[in-house]
Amino acid sequence: MASHEDNDHLPEETQGYKLSQPKQSLAEYQNMDANDESLQRYKKSLGLGGGKDLSDPNDSRVCIIQSLTMESPGRPPVTIDLSQPGAESTLKDKPFKIKEGAKFTMVASFRVQHEILSGLQYVQTVKRKGIRVSKDSEMLGSYAPNTDSQPIYTKRFQEEDAPSGMIARGHYNAVSTFVDDDKKQHLQFEWSFDISKDW
């Protein structure tokens, strides 16, 4: 049984939902129902059937998160480079500064290789002084392995407002997780931010 702490980093489950069939290989997807026009459109929307596969045979990861960027109007973007293994290990000690009440948007850049990635989600749990203050998730979608015609995927999240007011100001710790429909965690990292009166 998973602990409450483990569930903090997984998306909320939809009661009664389960994957309808086991994973299939890329070749099986590409050859499936070749005469079904709607399925061909669906496969094309996933990126199947076009371009040279860029999967690295020496890297077994299916989803490689390249970066996470925070954009806020009138400010230069702040990017967390996650492209190298272990790059995320120092983020907790280097807090971001966010102005209270500021509008911001997060943007994730990532690569997919070897197989279709189904139901990728971003889950973020934020704590202040050890108490969870929020848990949010954003569905990123399903993706085929990257090709030379689509070398990287970029997903822009919904715009958010930073909390405001004297009580909201202070230091926060966050855990961000990229997880798929199979509950496989592709990346999890801790980071921190400070809500302040000014940038």
What does each of the following model-derived ranges do?
Residues M1-P151, Q158-W199:
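N-terminal onset of structured domains
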